[in-house]
Amino acid sequence: MKVSEILAGSTKAYPSIEIVPPLRGITNEELLESIAPFMEFKPKYINVTSHRDEYEFRQNEDGTFSRHLIRNRISETTVCAAIMSKYDVEVVPHLICGGNTKEEIESRLDNLAFMGINNIVALRGDSMTGEKRFSPTPGGYSYASELVEGIRSYQGSNAYRRSRGLQTDDRYFCI
């Protein structure tokens, strides 16, 4: 169910949860156990945040420095899959402009569609540590409004669903 439908059909207040994907090294069971106490409140949906990957500069033997990608967290898509495997609750992953090319966003949309996830929070995202201003990823989106248009354009083509012979719907993703 789309979160917009949940909100429109609600006559009383209800909780929702927002979680940050855990650091690498946590098990699936530990993740689900950490969420369990909140499930007693019967949330209608769970938001799963997303953050840019970080980089660090390491000195090479010749004295120069090279940039190395650091991925400290489990992906929001993986966290959504874990939640869906145990709980009957809508998951709402965040997609961000920063750190993603347009093609990487489309790949994430393919994965979300494959999993049956059709709710998304589209954000520009934060600047990288040490940046004074947000710098878009080359080949990516600069603004959340561009990301939303990219998602709408993607869902309009329903590339993934058509390639799998599934029913198409121009309103597949709720943004």
Task: Give short role names for the model-derived ranges.
Residues 1-17, 159-172:
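N-terminal amphipathic alpha-helix/helix-capping segment at the start of soluble metabolic enzymes
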Residues 5-10, 35-42, 78-88, 109-117, ...:
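Acidic (Asp/Glu)-rich catalytic clusters
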Residues 15-21, 44-48, 91-95, 120-122, ...:
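Hydrophobic faces of well-ordered beta-strands that scaffold small-molecule active sites
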Residues 19-23, 50-54, 97-99, 124-129:
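Active-site-proximal loop/turn and secondary-structure-junction residues that shape catalytic pockets
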Residues 25-39, 102-109:
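Short, acidic/polar
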Residues 41-74, 128-139:
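Glycine-rich, proline-tolerant flexible connector loops at the mouths of alpha/beta enzymes
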Residues 60-93, 139-174:
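Alpha-helix-loop-beta-strand connector modules within alpha/beta enzyme cores
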Residues 101-149:
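Flexible, glycine-rich active-site loops centered on histidine and acidic residues
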